[in-house]
Each structure stands twice: as structure tokens, then as C-alpha cells.
Amino acid sequence: MRRHVILITYGEPATPAFADQLRYSWRILLGLTRLVAPIPGPLLPLIAVSRGRSRNQLWSSEHYGSPLESITDVQARGLEMALERGRPEDDWHVHVAYEFRDPLLTTMLDQLPADEPVDILPMYAADSAFTHEISRTTVRDWAARAGAARAARVSVLPALDEELLADVSARYIARALETRKIGGHDWALVLAAHGTLLEPPRPMETGREATERVCAAIGRRLGDRFGGVFSGWLNHTRGGRWTEPPMQETLHRVADSGFQNVLYFPYGFLADNAESELEGRVFLRAHPWRTVVHLPCLNSEPEFVAALARHVLSARVQEPAELAGV
């Protein structure tokens, strides 16, 4: 049987080009920011232009280009090969779609045969209104339009098990310690995640608690490899009060604790983007560390891709009602 898997992320322009950043910012404002911030309609174009311009200027000044979409492509190819090894009797096809970039999820779904099942795999560390629920809502709306024309099911898979993600992340960090011959009592481990609102304007799952559990689980596994384990949030500014401590405050605490060697790992992201890479870079250089190791995200790490494949395969043996994304 032919089976389809769609990896879904926000997407992100690869270059600082203002037109691309503007369109991306506009789509995020319409599809995400208004979920958490009651922004009047007339202000949306102004905010989109401001956000697009600020990203263009920052990326240009930092000579930065986002690897997110190219990484997602590599993840997709790796996952397809892992699925073929795991269940060779099926004909696996892994695709990539984005929430706020082309190809959009609905565009990809329209292109797939109506009689072939589809599993959608949101590439986020925690399930929240800003991650998996966006995909679920998109699929529900799309399915209502598709109606009876869609014979095979379309399912949005849950997030990876928290302890499993922590295991994979901790082993990834441990391998980096061994390869680089670093770590010990004079090193600090700094764990970074995307921030979220503490008091959203309406009840919603923010993913904060799940993210904190993953962070704590990584810390438990690696606490004896470092002199201290710290965590911080990469926050935005609009919409209200955000998660604490912000990364700036965390790094001040690390420095005040006497650490001069830092291993920085953005555990809350499954693929590198401007927030995991560029924001971390900017915050870290505000201090005169002796040594900084900025680890990439899990990206296409073989153990991580293998875990994704097992996740897809185990999900497929469950009853359809348990997995329905519509």
C-alpha cells in the first residue's frame, strides 16, 4: 500500500529579502499572532511591514540565512528511508509542507490521491495551540471542504513522547561532549526553548508545561556532566507576559555563577531556524565567555530520525479513531 507522511513546520524564508520576510510575517500575523493577541485589523499591515523590515535588517547585518527549509527536506528524505527499512512492504512517500510558507499544508493535501492514507507529522517538541493544533484546525477545515471525495483518512500525529525526546537529546549532547572533549564542573549547560504567553487572552494549551518537562528530563540525564544546568526562553514581546526566565536573564545568572564555559542547546526546536541559531548567537555574545559551544538542533541526527520513523509506524497500527486529525 502507498502511504504518505507530511512533515509540517512553520517554514521560514531562506534569505533576508524584504518581500519574502513581509509575506511570511503577514501570514504569521493572520494565522498565529491573532490567536494570542487581539490586534485590530487596521494595524496588521503596519505590524507586518515593521516585522518584515526588522527581520530583513537583522539578518542582513548578521549575514544570516535560515537553514530551516533545507533541513526539513533532509529530515524528510531520512525519514522516508527509515520508514522503508522499518516496513518495506509499504510504499512510503514523505513530503514537506509549511504552515506559513509555500507549499501550504492544504496545497499538499490537494495534490495527494484521495484513496491513499496520509499521516501529518508536526515537527515541534510540544503539542500546543501554536503547533499541532494549527495543523489539526487546518485539516478539519480542509476535510470539511473535501467532503466525501476523500476516501482515505488524514491524521495529525501527536508529539513525540517527552521522555523519548529527552533521551535522544541527552545522548546527542553526551556524544558532543565526548567528541569535543568538553564538559565538567567548570561548564554550564544552557537549554533554550521558544517562549510562550503565561496568560493568553483566552484558555488555550500553550505547551509550556510539556516543554518544561522535556527540559527537566534532559537536565536529570546530564546533570553530572556539567557544573550547572540552566534553562531560558526565547520570548517575543507582543500579547502580554511571556515565559520566565528570558534567555538574557538566564545567561546573566550563568555568568554570575562564575561559569566561563557554556554549551548552549536549543532543545525546544527540532530543526534550526533564526530563533534557535541567530537569537542564541546574539544573546551569547553579550558576555565574555572563555568558550562557547552552540550545538545545532537535532535536525537530521540519525537517532532522532529513527525515533520519528518508529513514531509513525507505531501510530499506524492504532485504531483510526484514535488518530483522526479531523
Can you describe what each PLM-predicted range is?
Residues 1-326:
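Extended amphipathic ligand-handling, pore-lining, and cofactor/metal-binding catalytic surfaces
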